[in-house]
UniProtKB/Swiss-Prot annotation:
GO CC term (a single one): mitochondrion
Disruption phenotype: No visible phenotype under normal growth conditions at the permissive temperature of 30 degrees Celsius, but mutant seedlings develop chlorotic leaves with aberrant chloroplasts under the restrictive temperature of 20 degrees Celsius.
Residues that hold ATP according to the record: G98, P99, S100, G101, V102, G103, K104, D105, N255
Species in which this protein is naturally found: Oryza sativa subsp. japonica
Protein name as catalogued: Guanylate kinase 2, chloroplastic/mitochondrial
Function recorded in the entry: Essential for recycling GMP and indirectly, cGMP. Essential for chloroplast differentiation at early stage of leaf development. May not be involved in the synthesis and maintenance of the organellar DNA during leaf development.
Amino acid sequence: MLLTRRFSSALARSPLLPRSLPPPRAVPATPPAPRPPPRRLMSSSSSGWHHSSRPPPPPPSGADKDQLFRGLEAALGTTFSSEPLAPPPQPMILVISGPSGVGKDAVIQRLQEEREGMHFVVTATSRAKRPGEVDGKDYYFVTKEEFLTMIERKELLEYALVYGEYKGIPKQQIRDYMAKGYDIVLRVDIQGAATLREILGESAIFIFLVAESEEALVKRLIHRKTETSDMLLVRVATAREEVKRMNNFDYVVVNSEGNLEGAVKQVESIIDAEKAKVHKRTVNI
């Protein structure tokens, strides 16, 4: 017994043991996980797809057309609009060009006879009238001095010096007819088409008229009998170079001998296709 007390006293004085032990740390209790809310079956009235009150059902199929129409309006809670679904067509600019002798005037004349709502711009020129041409219909025939005045006043959308004579397109004529909803048709030479492409960019439609072959084109130029031999040589040489500009146009239409109607219909198809486009061309003059 005495031995046990001495051992206990010595053990108590030992530096290896702390005099007192700290109280145990309290571990916070983990809160219970929240219970998920009870699942509910979603109905069509509570899904957010419909109003809180179920719409009335449509009338039976035995109803007449007017009752069925009104019943569908009531079921959908709306009225059906009579406004057009497609946006209205916008006025556009059509540029028709090609080498001399391809029949630009013949194609345009048939378009004038076939289609409504189109204005064919009358070009101003300083050259003399040819037999059968009418001032104000085929061209506005002015003197070179008058034409230069129009240039100074910036009255022309485009102008060029072609074979020693001026040709140009009056701006105001285009603005007036586009404001009335008319499509604009411009008949220009290759040089004028290149200038218009720089001015109008992709806002206009460029159509290149061409003969079925080089041989056919030369024969047409000879058949016109409007130029001297020297001028005819210039026309043919120029036409051969102008055909190389075909890639600068949006469409190519072949006006073959004896098939004018086919060429005109193809041009009309191009116009109809452009009218049906979702993304319209925007024109600012």
